[in-house]
Amino acid sequence: DAMLRIAPMPHASILVIAAGLIWLCIWRSTPRLAGIPVMALGVALALLARPPDVLVSSDARLIAIRSGATVFLVTQHKPDRFTLEQWAPVWGEVPLTPAQCTENTCRLGPVLFAAAPPADCTAAVLVSPAELTGCAGLPVIDRLYVYRNGATAAWVKGAKVTLRTDRAAQGSRPWVVPYPQL
């Protein structure tokens, strides 16, 4: 394979690198060298970017959970090849490892995967391919959540969970499935 996979860069990083490169190309004298530290800042911003801890597909059948340096893949069906190809660059060269779940639950770092309502709700975020209830105050990414909001990415930092959904990123466009009326 003659391809090197790298994690995607944040928009700010690309803009800073482009600004430094433009500065470097426009000027001819020594002030143009000021573009080099600006480009270095853009590269530093790219290196500081953190990939999501959880990715959930738009149908909640495919879930990837990052725990430390390992990315676990949780699925109850055959994984969708297209989705896996789209997710591959998110973590760079880190391979996806199938999660070994017992009794329909997995605790992978601060994330709890549950195929049925869990008895223990002590996690930063609860992820499930089924509809779940019963864990008050805990962010739940389940089948109903992704039905309403689309594919979801989650970043976990301590007890704080940041969610980013496909519907929030895409907005109301002709090609986006309309928000379901329940």
Segments (PLM) and residue ranges:
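Helix N-terminus capping/helix-initiation residues
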Residues: P10-H11, D80, D142
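Transmembrane helix-bundle segments that form internal channels/tunnels in multi-pass membrane proteins
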Residues: D1-G68
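Short, flexible beta-strand-to-coil junctions
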Residues: S58, H77, P117, P129-L132
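Solvent-exposed soluble domains appended to multi-pass membrane proteins
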Residues: A119-L182
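Glycine-centered flexibility motif
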Residues: A19-L21, G42, G109, G150, ...
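Membrane-interface segments at or immediately adjacent to transmembrane helices
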Residues: L48-F113
